[in-house]
């Protein structure tokens, strides 16, 4: 017995048109984006939106950016993760963008790949007082990505650490 609602012809045509538009926009955005950054790949958000993954890396700082394929690239992505190289670790400095779209998970996957490519065994970061209003969401996010999370509730701070095995 089928429990999935069957899509009608109009819904399928709308999905196809949306995908065709995203593919066209992806081509244009990749061409423009490649002038500013290194294109690492494409990925899908948890809402089935295609995203271009790119990075700018000067050897001291690495910025991983996501650019959607629904709007034109205008020099700025819709989500970013900024990290710096520290001895035997990459240290996450900031993650900017809307929550609960799967964008952070896409960036984290690519950050771990960069760490492995550079033979860097650890990714670290801090949880600051400014993050405290969404600390539970951060703990869930980092634990989902196999980070050890240490929280000090008294000082409203913490640290995260991932070690490649």
Curated annotation (Swiss-Prot):
Q: What is this protein called?
A: Uncharacterized protein YocC
List the Gene3D superfamilies. Answer: 3.40.630.30
Record InterPro entries: Acyl_CoA_acyltransferase
Q: From which lineage does this chain's organism come?
A: Bacteria, Bacillati, Bacillota, Bacilli, Bacillales
Q: Which species expresses this protein natively? A: Bacillus subtilis (strain 168)
Alphabetical UniProt keywords? Coiled coil
Question: Coiled coil located at which positions?
Answer: 1-38
